[in-house]
């Protein structure tokens, strides 16, 4: 099977500015130190593939109460629309593309892990390549585990031809193993040169492991790895919330892991435009297709004068960076439910008017999430003092010096405190792909999402794409409710 390999093109922006160069068979690649770098860089390209992001926002945001399909009313009704109403099926194109793209990433990490060890490279550099591969493989598998449950574990470049689902426990064990090994192999963020920022780091591996343990309700382990990040001295919160998403603060002090956003002109699948253009303002100014619009429910859920609402939602009539937002003439300014025409401000790209070559980085792990992971795990362990301390750090930054808003939370009842932490996660991490999974893992989904079409014992997991089941002669057992 051919492996598409990418090389750096010498621009000073970052190592992820990549172009297609050649096709080299896995049988003879990589062999040299130069090949090892190319193979390592090729893993990251999957994160920038439009098909990766086309799975992200319909599943992670539009299936929640935070976002709507968006675009104009008739656009993508058969592909994106069903995620808003829980009417998608096992043949949905976006689900299929997401599954295949995640396994493409896994395949590329396996090439590095299988073939880089024998290459004669300086040991610390080789360790870094292997650590990057283990982190990225864990990231891809964590998306699969969260979305589908137990999935096929393909941990080498070759298989015996029999592909079956592993248990969820075994899937998470593989993820944890990769991340623990990555922690020992990777450098800290501060050890990288500026042109290598965006590569996996020890802090990113620890932060992802904290998230993975949180999702498994292993509170002590979630606390341990969150504290490792907190105490590393590598990260802190940006003083101004909206700067955490600003182009001028990419790879900044709050960024634990983000995807570089230099796209390839003219290649819609290779570029980061799959993330920004899909969600950009539709109509005037022409910034994108307008999918994944913040919902009225999300807007109304913010506390009074919370700056994070304005930093998350673009409204018609606003002026951003000197550009007036008129919106889409095919979309009602306010529909019959009271929903205004809105857009996701966290993907706003100043001065950009074309779909390709978008330069907005996507933040995958922020330090704020790590603080909230710790707060939640401490609250679950009934340590309200520590939980409130980390919760207050997040809220204090959100105030931006205005003592009259977002009062400090003092609740110590465990259940009530957890409710407040989940609300804080909703507002701090809005439109970043957490809300649906937070509702599912906390048991809140039936009550919150039931009116939108969510069915208990079905929609907690996505369906295995039918095409994948056909390829494996139905060896992949379908998830409950999707048979």
Model-based region annotation:
Residues 275-293:
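Short, cationic low-complexity segments
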Residues 293, 297-298, 306-308:
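Conserved, charge-rich beta-strand/loop surface module that forms ligand/interface-binding patches
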Residues 1-9:
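Sec-dependent bacterial lipoprotein signal peptides
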Residues 11-60, 70, 79, 85-274, ...:
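Acidic/polar-rich alpha-helix caps and helix-coil junctions
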């Amino acid at each position: 099977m051919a492996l598409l390999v990418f090389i750096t093109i010498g621009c000073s922006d970052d190592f992820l500015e990549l172009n297609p160069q050649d096709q080299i068979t896995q049988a003879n690649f990589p062999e040299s130190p130069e090949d090892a770098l190319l193979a390592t860089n090729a893993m990251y390209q999957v994160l920038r593939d439009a098909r990766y992001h086309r799975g992200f926002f319909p599943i992670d945001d539009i299936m929640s109460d935070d976002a709507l399909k968006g675009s104009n009313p008739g656009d993508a009704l058969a592909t994106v629309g069903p995620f808003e109403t829980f009417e998608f099926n096992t043949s949905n194109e976006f689900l299929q593309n997401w599954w295949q793209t995640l396994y493409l990433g896994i395949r590329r990490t396996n090439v590095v892990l299988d073939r880089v060890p024998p290459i004669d490279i300086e040991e610390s550099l080789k360790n870094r390549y292997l650590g990057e591969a283990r982190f990225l493989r864990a990231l891809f598998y964590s998306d699969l585990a969260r979305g589908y449950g137990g999935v096929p574990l393909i941990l080498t470049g070759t298989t015996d031809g029999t592909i079956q689902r592993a248990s969820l426990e075994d899937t998470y064990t593989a993820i944890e193993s990769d991340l623990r090994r990555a922690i020992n192999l990777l450098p800290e963020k501060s050890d990288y040169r500026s042109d290598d920022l965006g590569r996996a780091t020890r802090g990113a591996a620890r932060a992802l492991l904290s998230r993975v343990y949180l999702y498994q309700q292993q509170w002590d382990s979630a606390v341990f790895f969150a504290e490792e990040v907190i105490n590393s001295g590598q990260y802190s919160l940006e003083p101004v919330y909206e700067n955490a998403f600003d182009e001028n603060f990419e790879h900044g002090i709050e960024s634990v892991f983000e995807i570089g956003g230099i796209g390839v002109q003219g290649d819609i699948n290779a570029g980061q435009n799959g993330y920004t253009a899909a969600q950009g303002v539709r109509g005037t100014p022409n910034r994108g297709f307008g999918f994944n619009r913040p919902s009225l429910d999300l807007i109304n859920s913010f506390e009074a004068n919370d700056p994070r609402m304005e930093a998350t939602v673009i409204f018609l009539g606003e002026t951003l960076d000197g550009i007036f937002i008129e919106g889409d003439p095919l979309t009602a300014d306010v529909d019959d439910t009271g929903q205004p025409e809105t857009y996701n401000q966290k993907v706003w790209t100043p001065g950009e008017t074309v779909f390709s070559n978008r330069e907005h980085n996507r933040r995958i792990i922020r330090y704020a999430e790590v603080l909230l992971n710790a707060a939640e795990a401490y609250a679950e362990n009934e340590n309200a003092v520590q939980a409130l301390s980390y919760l207050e750090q997040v809220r204090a930054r959100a105030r931006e010096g205005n003592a009259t808003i977002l009062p400090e939370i003092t609740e110590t009842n465990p259940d009530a405190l957890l409710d407040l932490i989940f609300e804080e996660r909703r507002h701090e991490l809005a439109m970043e792909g957490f809300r649906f999974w937070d509702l599912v893992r906390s048991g809140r989904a039936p009550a919150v999402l039931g009116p939108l079409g969510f069915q208990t014992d079905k929609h907690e997991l996505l369906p295995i794409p039918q095409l994948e089941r056909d390829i494996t002669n139905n060896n992949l057992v379908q998830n409950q409710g999707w048979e």
